[in-house]
Amino acid sequence: MSAASPPSADSPASTHPARRAWMAVMARSARADLEAALNRAMEGLPLPAFDWLRPPEIGLAMVRGRIGGTGDAFNLGEATVTRATLRLRDERDEGTIVGVACHLGRDRRRAELAAIADALLQTPQHHARLQAQLIAPLASQLAAQHAQRQQDAASTRVEFFTMVRGD
């Protein structure tokens, strides 16, 4: 009996960290970017048939903060979130594949697209292509936007210094 090797981070069978990463990328991406990238990645193929387990719905989530960033928690306020859950229809019956999505805002179509992409990323036939053509471009776009925001903030930074008296 040989020991089974752990799944790689790129395999659809990998556990939470890889899935958490691609879901975070989709949650932070704009709908237009997500839709365009998903259409390119599917290469003209129609989106798969699915059944809604939870159609896109809008609700509120309590946003919590911490005093000083590390202290006691307090309720900062509420934020609007949209979530969706679907199950791919698979005539081969290889198992149930469930896609989920949750993001800030009220965009139901964005939640639907993210849930479909999440489900497809869990299938062996679509995983590698979607990682390369959907998640990687969206992640690099988000990184570029983040770098631009940091650069804009850095240009307004003020450096304070003190001089020693009496020397």
Model regions and ranges:
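Non-catalytic, beta-rich accessory domains that mediate macromolecular interactions or localization
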Residues: P12-S14, A18-W22, D33, D93, ...
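Charge-rich, low-complexity N-terminal segments
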Residues: M1-P46
